C-alpha cells in the first residue's frame, strides 16, 4: 500500500520510528518506503545505521553537540522555532552541508476532539510556529515546511488541516522545495480514504511544485502483532476485575495517557454480553487498568 502510494503520487513515505523501532525489520521495511524520521539524536542514528535511506529529524529543541552530528547523518533537520534555526543557521549555510533545514508550523486547526493531550494544535501548544510569528520572508537556508497534527486519523482530517494550512501558509510554499505532512495517517487501515489522500498529494505537487513527505508510524505495522497476557486472579468490587500479568502503564501507556481502549480478541463493549469485567494489572498503581 505504502509503496504504491509513493509510485502513484511521487511522495516520499518515512517511518516514524517513535511508533515502531524494531530495527531488525528495517531492511524489509526499507524495500517499500523512502526512509525514516526521528525525534532526536538516538533515533536519527538508528535510522541511519539500520535502514540507511532518507533520514529526517524533528525535535522541539536541539543541543549543540547533537546538531554537529545531525547535520552529517540527516537529510532534513526540522526546527520548532525560528530562534532555534537562527542558532544553528551557520551549519546550513556552509557549502559542504548536505542537510536541508525546515520549520514546523502550527496550522491552528484541531481535528482531535477528546484527545487534547495528543493535539499539537491545541491552546498553548509548544509544537510549531503559528502564523502570527512568521516573517514575510523565510530566513536564508530554510528549504521546507512541516506540520504534524493528526493521530490515527483518516484523510478527511488531513484535508481539513491542509485547507487551514494553505490559507495561512500557502504563500510560503513558493519559497521552499518541500512540504512534510507529518504523521498520524492511518493509511493501512481498511477504511482509510486512500484515493482522497492520493488526490491531495498530487494536487499539492501540481499546484506548488514541492516534494511531499508523509511520516506514518503505526500504519507501518498496524495490527502486526498481539499483546498476550494471562489472567492471574479475579477480584470482585462492584464488578469482576481480572488481574493480568501485563500492565497498561508499562506495556500499553497510551491506554492511560490518551486514554485509549485497545481492541480485545473476541471482546465486546460493556453490556453487550451477560458478563462485563475490567482488565487490570499486577502493579501497585491503583489506576493501572484498561477501562
Question: What name fits each language-model region?
Answer:
Residues 2-8:
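A short, N-terminal amphipathic alpha-helix
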Residues 11-178, 192, 200-203:
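Active-site-proximal beta-alpha core segment in soluble small-molecule metabolic enzymes
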Residues 22-24, 151-154, 186-189, 220-223, ...:
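Flexible loop/turn segments at secondary-structure boundaries
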Residues 75, 99-101, 143, 177, ...:
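Structural beta-strand/beta-sheet cores of well-ordered domains, especially the beta-sheet scaffolds
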Residues 105-109, 149-153, 185, 218-220, ...:
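Glycine-rich beta-alpha junction loops
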Residues 154-160, 188-197, 223-233:
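Short glycine/threonine-rich loop-to-helix capping motif typified by GTGT followed
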Residues 178-180, 186, 197-205, 210-220:
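Oxyanion-binding "anion nests"
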Residues 200, 214-291:
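Charged (often Lys/Glu-rich) extended helix/loop segments that serve as interaction or gating elements
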Amino acid at each position: 500500500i505504502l509503496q504504491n502510494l509513493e509510485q502513484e503520487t511521487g511522495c516520499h513515505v518515512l517511518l516514524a520510528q517513535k511508533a515502531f523501532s524494531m530495527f531488525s525489520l528495517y531492511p524489509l521495511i526499507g524495500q517499500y518506503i523512502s526512509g525514516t524520521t526521528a525525534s532526536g539524536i538516538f533515533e536519527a542514528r538508528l535510522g541511519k545505521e539500520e535502514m540507511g535511506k532518507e533520514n529526517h529529524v524533528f525535535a522541539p529543541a536541539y543541543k549543540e553537540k547533537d546538531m554537529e552530528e545531525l547535520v552529517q547523518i540527516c537529510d532534513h533537520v526540522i526546527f520548532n522555532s525560528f530562534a532555534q534555526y537562527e542558532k544553528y543557521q551557520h551549519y546550513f549555510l556552509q557549502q559542504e552541508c548536505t542537510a536541508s533545514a525546515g520549520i514546523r508550523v502550527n496550522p491552528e486547526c484541531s481535528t482531535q476532539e477528546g484527545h487534547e493531550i495528543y493535539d499539537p494544535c491545541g491552546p498553548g501548544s509548544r509544537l510549531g510556529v503559528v502564523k502570527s510569528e512568521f516573517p514575510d520572508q523565510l530566513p536564508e537556508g530554510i528549504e521546507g515546511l512541516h506540520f504534524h497534527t493528526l493521530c490515527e486519523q483518516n484523510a478527511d482530517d488531513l484535508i481539513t488541516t491542509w485547507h487551514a494550512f494553505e490559507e495561512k501558509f500557502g504563500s510560503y510554499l513558493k519559497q521552499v522545495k518541500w512540504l512534510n505532512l507529518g504523521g498520524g495517517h492511518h493509511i493501512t487501515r481498511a477504511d482509510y480514504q486512500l484515493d482522497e489522500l492520493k488526490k491531495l498529494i498530487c494536487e499539492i505537487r501540481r499546484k506548488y511544485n514541492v516534494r511531499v513527505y508523509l511520516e506514518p508510524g503505526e500504519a507501518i505495522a498496524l495490527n502486526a502483532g498481539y499483546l498476550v497476557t494471562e489472567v492471574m486472579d479475579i477480584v470482585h468490587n462492584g464488578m469482576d476485575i481480572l488481574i493480568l500479568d501485563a500492565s497498561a502503564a508499562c506495556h500499553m501507556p497510551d491506554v492511560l495517557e490518551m486514554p485509549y481502549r485497545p481492541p480485545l480478541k473476541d471482546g465486546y463493549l460493556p453490556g453487550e454480553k451477560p458478563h462485563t469485567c475490567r482488565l487490570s494489572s499486577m502493579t501497585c498503581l491503583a489506576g493501572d487498568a484498561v477501562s
